[in-house]
């Protein structure tokens, strides 16, 4: 169980670094926000998942 908790914590730390490169690339494209907002929102969705997962796993580790 500890490995799962450590993996979830790592994911919750590592995944937010992806938009650091992705979001400026979307805004630098010729179409800008109008064509790239789906990319930004789909990139933000996986960032939400590890947060409750870490909470659930943390409550089960004593």
UniProtKB/Swiss-Prot annotation:
Location within or outside the cell: Plastid, Chloroplast thylakoid membrane
Chief location of this protein within or outside the cell: plastid
Its membrane topology: Multi-pass membrane protein
GO CC terms, sorted: chloroplast thylakoid membrane; photosystem II reaction center
UniProt xrefs under InterPro entries: PSII_PsbZ (IPR002644), PSII_PsbZ_sf (IPR036512)
Pfam families: Ycf9 (PF01737)
Superkingdom: Eukaryota
UniProt keyword list: Chloroplast, Membrane, Photosynthesis, Photosystem II, Plastid, Reaction center, Thylakoid, Transmembrane, Transmembrane helix
Alphabetical GO biological process terms: photosynthesis; photosystem II stabilization
Transmembrane segment boundaries: 8-28, 41-61
Record's subunit section: PSII is composed of 1 copy each of membrane proteins PsbA, PsbB, PsbC, PsbD, PsbE, PsbF, PsbH, PsbI, PsbJ, PsbK, PsbL, PsbM, PsbT, PsbY, PsbZ, Psb30/Ycf12, at least 3 peripheral proteins of the oxygen-evolving complex and a large number of cofactors. It forms dimeric complexes.
Alphabetized PANTHER family for the sequence: PHOTOSYSTEM II REACTION CENTER PROTEIN Z
Protein name, entry field: Photosystem II reaction center protein Z
Organism: Selaginella uncinata
């Amino acid at each position: 169980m500890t490995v799962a908790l450590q993996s979830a914590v790592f994911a919750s730390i590592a995944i937010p670094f992806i938009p650091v490169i992705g979001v400026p690339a979307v805004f630098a494209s010729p179409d800008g926000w109008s064509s790239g907002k789906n990319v930004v929102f789909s990139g933000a969705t996986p960032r939400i998942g590890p947060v409750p997962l870490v909470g659930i796993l943390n409550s089960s580790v004593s």
